[in-house]
Design a protein with these regions (language model features):
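Basic polycationic patches enriched in arginine
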Residues: 4-7, 20
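N-terminal alpha/beta PP-like core and its mobile active-site loop of ThDP/TPP-dependent enzymes
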Residues: 13-366
Length: 366
């Protein structure tokens, strides 16, 4: 028995050695985390309806304590080589708003990454993160964080919490981000960054994505597998509704006496305005607009009733008061759209939500 146990131990040891050898034999490149991050984001592309483009157009950032020698150096050394531009704003909150606005303009198929220093520089991005997440707009946030090894402790602008030593200013990003990760080792990015981009490029999950980067980790060198930097194309999906649900919607439309359409930002992001125009003209259903949905149907179209809700117009709001069926296309049905659910007065009203996000599609008991 002892001999067999010794033989098994030797076999296990040999397997471990072979496993490590296979890892070492893989092609690798030695880069700092800052350099690797720039090269990785440059290779991330999206594709929808056969059209393909780079997802991260460049970086916005204000350099200071925490990101100068890490991501800052990586941007200086690698961004131009990779075809990424760098822009310096006057305020961190502003650069997140700019990135979200750019993503909106590009129908969520492109955005920017934003880098900041530790503490107040990072906290200035929190409001922008909340706006991006609420409005389903992709932005990649890379705030700097205190030293992962905690040898320099405390450091400038560190929150010295008396009971929770792992808390930093960047924890404020957790409730306003669709994805949050604080990395403490370079190799953790091998799993974290692909997941971050999966969420950024998913129309149902997108919003602010935050990867918190300790300043020592940013400057740490690591042997990265070269396959990590190969071009990756993320397919932007167009999920199809179930046939039974379509039949139910058709049945409701046939029975409705005063249906209206509320078109939101999703109609624009999905480039569905030709289908909206064809549908409303075919069936003669009036279209009302949310703030994000403005422009989905030409302003001078005979069936465009204009903005709806608390800050809406008379025509749209009078139609909403009498409507017995609301077809909500790509809208979050916010309080401004529904006037805090007081806009619709017909006791028999029903809602149909058409949205890639189940949470938004099911609002107002749709």
């Amino acid at each position: 028995m002892a001999l067999r146990a010794e033989r098994n131990a030797c076999q296990k040891s040999a397997e471990d050695v072979l496993g490590r050898a296979q890892i070492l034999m893989k092609k690798s490149i030695r880069l700092t985390v800052g350099q690797a991050l720039v090269r990785f984001v440059a290779k991330q592309y999206v594709e929808r309806d056969g059209r393909q483009n780079r997802f991260i157009e460049g970086f916005w950032g204000i350099f200071g304590h925490g990101n100068v020698s890490g991501l800052g150096q990586g941007i200086v050394e690698c961004a131009q080589e990779e075809g990424l531009r760098f822009y310096r704003p006057q305020n961190e909150q502003g650069m997140v708003h700019i990135s979200a606005a750019f993503a909106k303009h590009r129908n969520r198929l492109s955005t920017f990454a934003c880098t900041t220093s530790i503490g107040p520089g990072a906290l200035n991005m929190v409001t922008g993160a909340g706006v991006a997440t609420v409005n389903r707009l992709p932005v990649l946030l890379l705030p700097s964080d205190y030293f992962a090894n905690r040898v320099p402790d405390p450091v400038l602008q560190q929150i010295e919490h008396p009971n929770e030593r792992d808390v930093s200013a960047n924890d404020a990003f957790r409730p306003v981000s669709r994805f949050f990760d604080r990395v403490s080792r370079p190799e953790q990015l091998l799993a974290s960054l692909p997941e971050a981009f999966r969420i950024l490029t998913d129309p149902a999950e997108t919003g602010a994505v935050t990867v918190s980067l300790p300043e020592d980790v940013q400057a740490e060198a690591f042997d990265w597998p070269t396959e990590f930097f190969e071009k990756r194309v993320w397919h932007v999906r167009r999920p199809l509704p179930e046939r039974e649900l379509i039949k139910e919607v058709v049945s409701r439309l046939q029975k409705a006496e005063c249906p209206i359409i509320i078109t939101g930002g999703g109609t624009i992001y999905s480039e569905a305005w030709p289908e909206l125009k064809a549908f409303t003209e075919e069936f003669g259903i009036a279209v009302t607009e949310t703030q994000a949905g403005k422009g989905a149907l030409n302003w001078n179209h005979s069936l465009n009733a204009g903005p709806i809700g608390s800050n809406g117009g008379t025509a749209a709001n009078e139609l909403a008061t009498e409507a017995d069926l609301v077809l909500a296309l790509g809208t979050r049905l916010t309080d401004f759209t529904t006037a805090s659910r007081s806009q619709f007065q017909n006791p028999t009203i029903r809602f149909v939500g058409v949205n890639v996000a189940p949470m938004d599609a099911s609002k107002c008991a749709a």
